[in-house]
Amino acid sequence: MKLEIENAVFEYLKKTLNRDLSAMLVRGHSTTLRPVTYIVVDCSEPKPFGTLSAADGLFELVLEIRIADSAHDIDYRIQQKRVNAVFKALENFECSADGISVLSFEFELDSDARDDDNIGDVLKYSVIAQI
């Protein structure tokens, strides 16, 4: 389910964002695979919702969208435009993964992020999905 939701969000952003932002989307979690500037979709492992068991088929996940640029020459006005565009695009997200129904897709927070020589934002969403 993790990979299916990651892929669904990735493909949704790929078709929804403008060409420049869409070109920044990368797959994978290794920093060596990421060109700067980048946008990465990362989903946590699903865990059964509340006190339910996995057999009940209702899961909660955390989805993070990382939007980063070089810490050496980031333009924060442009970075904020990127963040706003991704946030706006996800307002109407509907999961297209077969056999998975996203029941709730709620924005939780925007925080800063740093890795290697990059700096940026993380948009965090709470996801409840059913299989």
Enumerate the language-model features and the residues they cover.
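Charged, amphipathic alpha-helical segments and their flanking helix caps
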Residues: 1-22, 29, 43-131
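Short secondary-structure junction/hinge motifs that connect adjacent elements
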Residues: 24-36
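Charged, often glycine-rich, active-site loop that binds/positions anionic groups
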Residues: 34-44
